[in-house]
């Protein structure tokens, strides 16, 4: 369907249907047409494709179009030809238009708002796109931003054929053929070195829309060019990427609607570098925020390493990173082969902004593009934050799941200045770095409390068991007292063994761990601490048995067998299943610590869930004891009521450590792991948990009498 419009005719709403072939003839007359056009194909002098839209006339010859863009569109621009065209030549390029589109009034998303409501506001003048806001605590907060200045008309360096004014009677035809992307135009205009967009990109502001455009351009280039990537192309590619890796752009990455943009950038740079051909001389392409080095290697090389020193921010402070390939590994590769490494000082922070997770990259991000025969490399990271109170993890970027993964690397050595990692490069893992945990609590006070309390606890447990041996025949004359002391002895014995294995595990933990020894220590720590809880559960069940069942009793042998089944059988089953299910996949242990893994397999739940469930059951038991002893005081004199209150308080004081209720403070340390107070209280209460057992055994004998 064809349609022709002349300069002295106004186009009415709905007069331009979807897919129409429109020819506009410019004359020296009244306003021609002002429209928001989608550029897809450049012919002579220029061609446009108009997608579906609704148009209406505005003031001074403006036409407002609300359009549904073609999926092939690569740019959207405002064009204005006013009445002034009768006295001058009217340029069609948006970058040359002197008259600006009246922006929607700002302040639409200002003021008090309703929580969780959203609104959209147009971008400032000279930019295209919208800003999205969300209301939180009755205040508008920006969440997305698509404002951009870059498009197909201005991303290239000035071309007289593109921006020259139209002469009289020049025809502009609408072309509906196959679209041409910015990447296609780039490869046509400067196929040798991709440099024809560098100047305008470097002059563009670091706003979210521009960042998204450049990321997409880099991605398209990396997928379009499969061969012939030489040093000149890599230099231009690096310069383009360097612009959006600038430290001043980091805050704007959070507003890009596509959260995958930072992942796409990292993957695109690595993919393009993989196609770099290195001739005779090593490649060294250095920009401020990206540094690429590459060379050819052979099996007779002694060893190879790349050393980077880059600024993290706008200060003069620099951090270093090194990639080392051992001679043994080099012997595995065919000759000649090439290795390439890329260092990024800021992309770690950019990934953090996109991930919205509580992790901090504490060094350079180093990418290693290696022959598939190379299975091991060593990486040395200088720490950005050199705090000794932070735990460091060696990680690799999982290119499929888009997250940092501890399975790719292992810590070899660490001090306050640097960390040495051994990593396994593969198709999934190309980029590596070190993470700093922001909330791990390392306190000398807490350490002293733990070890001093542990020593006192071990001494108290030994004293408790010694007293039990001395008075065993006197305190086990009845069946109920015998069962009660069986529970006390096993609680003390299992807690003593747990403390001993805890000390063993602490000595085995560190940057360099003995894996099999660490697995054994973790298994026994898990088993014995679970046994402590299950024996405390058995003690609680025995108290409930005494309260609820008075006249009907079970044989002593059945009760003893039941207690041992609960105390040792259940923990053994849980610990064995945990190690069998997680260790084959190397998900049983934490990195550098001999304890159950959390990040990968959530193996720690095999301890947390049973322990907290037992604490809840024991809390119910204590409540029933309080209720039972309180009933005895009803109707008695004031003196007897006071005695009952004292008796109840004493029962609570004895049962709380005996049944492990102090472990409930562990919930507080999980909810707020940054609180030093909760950690100190938890350490104090549990370090001295068994101390009362050595001195209050006689008092515990009276609890059963009180509740009957």
Curated annotation (Swiss-Prot):
Signal peptide start and end residues: none
Residues of the GAIN-B domain: 293-442
Keyword Ribosomal protein attributed: no
Pfam families (alphabetical): 7tm_2 (PF00002), GPS (PF01825)
Annotated TM spans: 452-472, 488-508, 531-551, 558-578, 607-627, 651-671, 675-695
Main subcellular location: membrane
Protein role: Orphan receptor.
Any further remark recorded for this protein: Most adhesion GPCRs undergo autoproteolysis at the GPS domain. ADGRF2 is not autoproteolyzed at the GPS motif because of the lack of a consensus catalytic triad sequence within GPS region of the GAIN-B domain.
Protein name as annotated: Putative adhesion G protein-coupled receptor F2P
Native organism: Homo sapiens (Human)
